[in-house]
């Protein structure tokens, strides 16, 4: 399962991730603080920040291991509900959320258009009328031009890793092969993981959103308020649930 070993080192490896920028983008994109669903919430970093800002937060993730770490961070003053579910099949929350967010390119872990469509339909069901969907994805440029044949590495006393990326077999997909070396007090334990991500052109995301009952309001790039360019690497989408009923 994705993140089975990754969960134990995820927070340390992501210690410099721009979580505050994601939170700022979410706040700026929503008209008021209401009930929000953080899909693919991971270890809860964004969920916790949103709760601190005054949102009523529910976090959902596929990984039980990630959710275990998320739950350990929550204090009694932050009543965040964390649940293990598949974002393509959210159950128990029909019409309950003012907004749904899918951050940190989590949507790129869905390998097919049908997976994305099922996720959008699932989100549509749990949103209140005219609720907001916010998500970010890697751009086509980043998947096709930046990641392939790239190697990332880092080393310190506790954790070291080698991260190699290469083009996947599907269009606009990439494979990440990762090897981690974690100090256990006496020696280094090694574990390996392979993750696959895929993206789609903006026009295809817009079409999928429309077919699932959403109106696309805006697409921006790289934590700015500007429209994407040919070299933008991360795209941010804001869509709103229309009055159309999707079965």
From Swiss-Prot:
It is an enzyme of class 2 (transferase). Its EC number is 2.1.1.-. CDD domains: AdoMet_MTases (cd02440). GO terms for biological process: methylation. Gene3D superfamilies: S-adenosyl-L-methionine-dependent methyltransferases, Vaccinia Virus protein VP39. GO terms for molecular function: methyltransferase activity. SUPFAM superfamilies: S-adenosyl-L-methionine-dependent methyltransferases. Keywords: Methyltransferase, S-adenosyl-L-methionine, Transferase. May be a S-adenosyl-L-methionine (SAM)-dependent methyltransferase. Belongs to the methyltransferase superfamily. This is Putative methyltransferase YqeM. The lineage of its organism: Bacteria, Bacillati, Bacillota, Bacilli, Bacillales. The gene is yqeM.
């Amino acid at each position: 399962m994705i993140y089975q070993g990754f969960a134990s080192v995820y927070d340390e490896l992501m210690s410099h991730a721009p979580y505050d920028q994601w939170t700022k983008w979410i706040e700026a994109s929503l008209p008021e603080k209401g009930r929000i669903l953080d899909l693919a919430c991971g270890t809860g970093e964004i969920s916790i920040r949103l709760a601190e800002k005054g949102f009523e937060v529910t976090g959902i993730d596929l990984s039980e291991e990630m959710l275990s770490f998320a739950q350990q961070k929550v204090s009694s003053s932050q009543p965040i509900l964390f649940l293990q579910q598949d974002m393509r099949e959210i159950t128990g929350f029909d019409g309950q959320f003012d907004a749904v967010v899918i951050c940190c390119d989590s949507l790129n872990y869905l390998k097919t258009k049908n997976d994305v469509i099922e996720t959008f339909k699932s989100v549509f069901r749990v949103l209140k009328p005219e609720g907001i969907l916010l998500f970010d994805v890697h751009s086509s440029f980043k998947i096709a031009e930046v990641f392939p044949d790239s190697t990332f590495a880092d080393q310190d006393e506790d954790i070291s890793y080698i991260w190699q990326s290469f083009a996947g077999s599907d269009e606009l997909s990439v494979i990440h092969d990762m090897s981690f070396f974690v100090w256990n007090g006496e020696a280094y334990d090694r574990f390996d993981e392979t993750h696959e991500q895929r993206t789609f052109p903006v026009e295809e995301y817009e079409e999928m959103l429309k077919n699932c009952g959403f109106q696309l309001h805006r697409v921006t790039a790289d934590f700015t308020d500007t429209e994407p360019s040919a070299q933008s690497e991360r795209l941010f989408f804001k869509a709103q649930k229309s009055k159309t009923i999707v079965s």
